[in-house]
């Protein structure tokens, strides 16, 4: 499959909510979206939705590049509908800025999913209130820069503005020691 080609392929295996294999054996990563990694909050729902949408169906794959894992990064269409946008609109994948020809549509869909708290943006996967009153330390795992920071409740308004996105690998902790043992460092913006 050439990087610039626009062709139809049958989906033979769905790996997770944003990647799959086609009948040529090529692995495709959907452009402009980020679904939860396997085992994280919402990962099963994202994979199930993508499977329901495209498994065993012919999709149009419009690759733009290859990634560091040698996957084709592509806009994907089923019946002339953007699969990229359908995943974002469902709330089971986050919009991740891209050069997709559907970028504006995906950005709007992502904003709507977040505003309406659906999918990974629901209270199941995106939390500001701790599930246990004894475990109030917020741990943020920033995938983009590798920083894993924790915020104790005495952080004031900074603490109040932090969301624990379980779908991104964020966690709640019961003690600073527990956070540190999990590889998180205390943020410098808190006392």
Outline where the language-model segments fall.
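Polybasic, low-complexity, intrinsically disordered segments
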Residues: 1-2, 111
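Stable alpha-helical elements in mature extracytoplasmic
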Residues: 46-50, 79, 83, 88, ...
